[in-house]
Swiss-Prot record:
Its EC number is 5.4.3.8. Keywords: Chlorophyll biosynthesis, Cytoplasm, Isomerase, Porphyrin biosynthesis, Pyridoxal phosphate. Its main location: cytoplasm. This is Glutamate-1-semialdehyde 2,1-aminomutase. It comes from Chloroflexus aggregans (strain MD-66 / DSM 9485). PANTHER family: GLUTAMATE-1-SEMIALDEHYDE 2,1-AMINOMUTASE (PTHR43713), GLUTAMATE-1-SEMIALDEHYDE 2,1-AMINOMUTASE 1, CHLOROPLASTIC-RELATED (PTHR43713:SF3). GO terms for cellular component: cytoplasm. The keyword Lipid metabolism does not apply. The modification N6-(pyridoxal phosphate)lysine is found at residue 272. It catalyses: (S)-4-amino-5-oxopentanoate = 5-aminolevulinate.
Length: 438
């Protein structure tokens, strides 16, 4: 693999400087480009669907800060709302009307949610949701799925996806065995394994937590009946069903994957889009569960910056802008995502490059496969069948052509309302050129 080092010379210098003062030179592991080789690209600005690196190179962006930027970079309405609020105050550590306004809007969009608590990250959301599930049931065991990533809380760093998958780690040192022992992992899409587990230990299980689309081990769709089957198992055994929609929330549909696939979870975890590009998370769900959260109930959770007005106004403006006028802007982004995914499939067939392409709403994923007859429906298959070396060559071929994709095959891609047909045309032209040289 040849990387045009002169094109990224300032990024390389920045990375060398960062490594002296930041562990690994980055503040989140996947950003280190271990999944594609070379040095990470350093960016300095973004506008709409485009970003510019420190060397002055312009890219069409399909990472979008790992999903939050549904409207694209620096959307005028969001920027103006943040600027106006910043002049009024950035944080009060006290209630504001913005929290209630955003809460009401989320409840309007997601039918299963009756109450919501805002936090500062997706990790806080999942960690708090699991604590709430244990408080509600009096049980300790958590069930998660291999390759699904729910943040970096100790109990969830067991066979996780995202950066953990990119680095090839089974789990993380520093997680006590006693904590890991309370987390049981099974393969994604294996409803029989879940049923067997509940048959043996159902009375001990506090919660099942699952990504509706396993987008932290690439892009794995649920098999028909998998998610609804999990819901039935939790209901039968008195466990809490937690749908982690930190990534899929407001991305695959206005009401998330649960609205798209008619699911009714007990608790939902949200993040990314509801902060409009600022740090945010939320856990939400049925009133009888949320009423256990302090100060209404005994389950303690708190945060200095939780519900801060900058994140609230950014999220509120993003959702109001995306889901107005019969969701026209959002649906147009869905159409562009479908066109991009179909183009990838067609070009893969034309150049005889084995691919597994998936897309739902404004999310997509593209696996390069080791064999034409390979498939990926879970983490075992992702590790065995994904051709990461070929993806790395593809990543840099696309970057050299001004297209920025996730620097890991085990991450999803995103389209924004700022993307255009011309962006898709340029992207598919670059894909064809890249495929021709792979």
């Amino acid at each position: 693999m040849t990387i045009a080092t002169e094109r990224y010379s300032r990024s390389q210098a920045n990375f060398a400087a960062a490594q002296a003062v930041i562990p690994g030179g980055v503040n989140s592991p996947v950003r280190a480009f271990r999944g594609v080789g070379g040095s990470p690209i350093f960016f300095e600005r973004g506008q709409g669907a485009h970003i510019w690196d420190v060397d002055g190179n312009r890219y069409i962006d399909y990472v979008l800060s790992w999903g939050p930027l549904l409207l694209g970079h620096a959307h005028p309405a969001v920027v103006n709302a943040i600027a106006t609020q910043a002049q009024r105050g950035t944080s009060f550590g006290a209630p504001t009307e913005l929290e209630t306004d955003l809460a009401r809007l989320v409840l309007d969009l997601v039918p299963s949610i009756e109450q919501i608590r805002f936090v500062n990250s997706g990790t806080e959301a999942t960690m708090s949701a699991l604590r709430l599930a244990r408080a509600a049931t009096g049980r300790r065991l958590i069930v998660k799925f291999n390759g699904c990533y729910h943040g970096h809380a100790d109990m969830l760093l067991v066979q996780a996806g995202s950066g953990v998958a990119t680095l090839g780690l089974p789990d993380s040192p520093g997680v006590p065995p006693t904590v890991a022992a309370d987390t049981i992992t099974i393969e994604y899409n294996d409803l029989d394994a879940a049923a067997d587990l509940f048959a043996r230990r159902g009375s001990e299980i506090a919660a099942v937590i699952v990504e509706p689309i396993a987008a932290n081990m690439g892009f794995v769709l649920p098999k028909p009946g998998f998610l609804s089957g999990l819901r039935e198992l939790t209901q039968q055994h008195g466990a809490i069903f937690i749908l982690d929609e930190v990534m899929t929330g407001f991305r695959v549909a206005p009401g998330g994957a649960q609205a798209l696939w008619n699911l009714d979870p007990d608790l939902t975890c949200l993040g990314k889009v509801i902060g409009g590009g600022l740090p945010v998370g939320a856990y939400a769900g049925k009133r009888h569960l949320m009423q256990l959260v302090a100060p209404a109930g005994p389950m303690y959770q708190a945060g200095t910056l939780s519900g801060n007005p900058l994140a609230m106004i950014a999220g509120l403006t993003t959702l109001r802008t995306a889901f107005t006028d019969d969701n026209t802007a959002f649906q147009r982004a869905v159409t562009l995502t479908t066109r991009l995914a179909n183009g990838l499939r067609e070009l893969g067939e034309r150049y005889r490059i084995p691919l597994q392409v998936g897309n739902v709403g404004t999310m997509f994923g593209c696996y390069f496969l080791r064999h034409a007859d390979a498939q990926i429906t879970n983490y075992v298959e992702a590790k065995a069948n994904a051709d990461t070396q070929r993806y790395a060559r593809f990543f840099w071929a696309m970057a050299d052509r001004g297209i920025y994709l996730a620097p890991s095959q085990f991450e999803a891609g995103f389209v924004s309302t700022a993307h255009t047909d011309a962006d898709i045309d340029q992207t598919l032209t670059a894909v064809e050129e890249a495929f021709a040289q792979l």
